[in-house]
């Protein structure tokens, strides 16, 4: 995996931030001015197929996001770290915790999807899957989930 992440701060406390679906690492931008960069170092990672990694190969799964998160931490030399996850990223941080509990110091979930996933019927899954190729469906999902 290309280890691409935006790193902010130089503090000893390490934090990896994972965005929600349809988001990317730059989506955290409005919060940057509020971060404590003296005591914390933050890594904002793009998932496969998102942001700077758009067009990268899959798999495009929560398990792969968790794997890539641990690979990023290894690449950065972060033996221990905390995780912040929004929505789908909240599901991924739970998977990271399950995969490497000895490395995770704290979790913050912002409206997290459960680690077990969202309970959709077949029609719901088909609708969400079609968002990969249909901009109108993506817009409908964003409108539905953001009010």
Regions found by a protein language model. Give the residues of each.
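Active-site acidic short loop of glycosyltransferases
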Residues: 10-12, 77-80, 102
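Flexible "cap/lid" loop of the alpha/beta hydrolase fold
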Residues: 94, 98, 104-134
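Conserved HGGG/HGGXW glycine-rich cap/lid loop of the alpha/beta-hydrolase fold
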Residues: 6-55
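The conserved SAM/SAH-binding core of class I Rossmann-like methyltransferase domains
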Residues: 43-45, 86, 110
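Conserved alpha/beta-hydrolase "nucleophile elbow" surrounding the catalytic nucleophile
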Residues: 81, 85-87
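Residues forming the Rossmann-fold NAD(P)(H) cofactor-binding site
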Residues: 90
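Conserved acidic catalytic loop of the alpha/beta-hydrolase fold
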Residues: 64-81
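Catalytic nucleophile-loop/oxyanion-hole region of alpha/beta-hydrolase
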Residues: 54-66
């Amino acid at each position: 995996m290309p280890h691409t992440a935006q790193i902010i701060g130089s503090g000893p406390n390490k934090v990896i931030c994972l965005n929600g679906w349809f988001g990317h690492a730059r989506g955290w931008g409005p919060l940057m001015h509020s971060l404590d960069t003296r005591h914390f170092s933050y890594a904002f990672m793009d998932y496969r197929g998102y942001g700077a990694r758009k067009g990268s190969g899959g798999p495009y799964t929560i398990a792969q996001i968790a794997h890539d998160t641990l690979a990023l931490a290894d690449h950065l030399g972060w033996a221990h770290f905390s995780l912040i996850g929004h929505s789908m990223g909240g599901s991924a941080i739970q998977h990271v915790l399950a995969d490497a509990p000895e490395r995770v110091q704290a979790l913050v979930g912002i409206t997290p999807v459960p680690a077990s996933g969202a309970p959709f019927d077949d029609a719901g899954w088909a609708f969400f899957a079609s968002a990969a190729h249909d901009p109108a469906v993506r817009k409908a999902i964003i409108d539905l989930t953001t009010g």
